[in-house]
Amino acid sequence: MVELRPVTEENFFDCIDLDVKDQQQDFIPENVCSLAEAYIALTSGDLVPMPYGVYDAEQNVLVGFVILSYSEEGDEELPEPYYCVWRIMTDANCQKLGYGRAAMEKLIEMAKEQPMGPAKKLCAVYTADNKAAAALFADVGMNAGKPDSEGNVLAVMDI
């Protein structure tokens, strides 16, 4: 149903033109900001971001944008290397058609293949009031913790 294609100079502008619904604007930064943050994370050595356009494989149409990241060092909450769904969004015009779940399934498959290095966990962070993200991550088997002091929730699954 969906195919993840790396963000390149050919699809860069199409990816940054994607947008979520008005009521979702507070939950996720614009894709151009996400790509800038990915560049900074990569050049600073913090983690390895892997940005992709999400395409409807049958219609060859861009429907969303994701970033899967890899942290070799781990951190306080996940002390071992891990993969993270750093960003996932479906364009406002393409929501409620199964693209988000299909993209998550592709990201899980990719993390299990361990393209950037070994890891035992896949995580995602979302704000506690983002019910759509909570439902999506729970639906694919991620276990959510309690919101932190800033209202962010860490969802984790074994891979």
What do these predicted regions represent?
Residues T90, K96-M110, A135, D139:
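Conserved acetyl-CoA-binding loop-helix of GNAT-fold acetyltransferases
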Residues V156-I159:
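Short beta-strand-to-coil "C-cap" segments at the C-terminal boundary of structured domains/repeats
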Residues A138-D148:
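Conserved acetyl-CoA-binding loop of GNAT-fold acetyltransferases
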Residues V2, P6-W86, D91-N93, M110-Q114, ...:
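Acetyl-CoA-dependent GNAT
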Residues L122-A134:
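Conserved beta-strand-loop-alpha-helix junction that forms the acyl-donor binding cleft
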Residues E113-V125:
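Conserved GNAT acetyl-CoA-binding A-motif
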Residues N130, S149-V153:
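Short acidic/glycine-enriched loop/turn segments that link adjacent beta-strands
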